[in-house]
């Protein structure tokens, strides 16, 4: 071999090494990121790159109202992504939810991205959070869902809006007949699918791994995630799922398309709207006032988003084959909500629920260990009404999933929010996380300033590391410590499908072998794992009741 040939081969080898290094290093992520639809320009704060108000579908306005989301159209030049898009149209159902969007509009299909990735080669895991609010309120712009803290843990945070209320969950015979898939009513859920697809197609440009997407939601968002785990449109797009207080399985039931259509037609009639054409012609605000939300919508078996109930999918083990982390709070509901102003005695509690439980009332109360007046207002009494609201269906998804041989990590969040700050004034916390003015009766009553447990939605700021965004409470060191633990569990789960990590309380997965005494992480000042055969028996007893009514 000549010297020139040797030098030539060395040069080729060096070039190959440099090329390999560049490929491993990946492209540097700046504040301008090229997506499949155009260039976005974000901003950076405290070491986190933010891309806000990113369109993931066409605006569902005009002829696109009450249609499945359509692919976003490409744009030319650089599109600024420095402020949140409009929040979904909604009435103030739950009080002030502290939105950061510029207003409320049907043009609301935007997502937000928080990343600390330096290059595209970082391939960070991704967390997509779907907000709660009964499918009729809430937004991805709410500060409590902010992705900055999870981004600092090495996970790309994403929030995504979806249509709510009448705009997201209205079915009608004419809409069904006109759609390509001969269905209607699941528009908000289809928006969530579109958001996941957009992230999967584009997140690599932000330093994310499209094959490591975990979805999470609280309350209505959690119900949504349980459905997204089952929908043929989304179940193969995700690598993990987290449920926080809710799932659309037993006792919640889907609607048939025919029933949903009939309900929609009757709603128009009751509102004095002569036809779907007339409804389409109404502006958004008068429309939502004429057709206000009536509680959380049932998913419709539209033959597209859902072809059968989530229970049926889980029973056949046809749900997403991914790790699951799920739980609920210790005070999702209060016995006084059932007793309705009467004395909190055992007999009054039984009387309040007898219309629901019938002949199984005594058996269910015994299973929950509610045997004295004192039990009504302690954790035993809290557990029963909390399970009737969100606890039982969340438990049932865990039960289904573990029986399928898939890893399940279950928690029970126990820690109450601290003393309210002076900012709360004459306001009171609302159900879904907002605040509202106290009623005249509430102003007269001596209400405790610290709840006896973790109320519905109280976990969000802790789990997402966003305590400081909520100025209505006087957060203490123990709150920040719990938040750090919860956030780390979330981040670890997104990274590995397992929440455990060095220095954390050990969290054992539920398996087919330990179902009768399932391990549960009690998240509190002193977090620890417990197993209670008695509690599992209580859930089985409640399941027996629900199945007897099907």
Question: Which residues does each PLM region occupy?
Answer:
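Alpha/beta-hydrolase active-site loop
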Residues: 108, 181-204, 259-262
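Substrate-access "cap/lid" subdomains that shape
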Residues: 97, 194-197, 201, 235, ...
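Active-site loop->helix "elbow" adjoining a glycine-rich segment at hydrolase catalytic centers
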Residues: 132, 187, 191, 219-222
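Bacterial Sec-dependent N-terminal signal peptides
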Residues: 1-29
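Non-catalytic accessory segments of hydrolases
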Residues: 20-186, 210, 476-486, 496-506, ...
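Short glycine-enriched nucleophile-adjacent loop
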Residues: 222-234
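Alpha/beta-hydrolase fold nucleophile elbow
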Residues: 206-218
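Mobile gating loops/cap/lid regions near enzyme active sites that modulate substrate access
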Residues: 395, 399-550
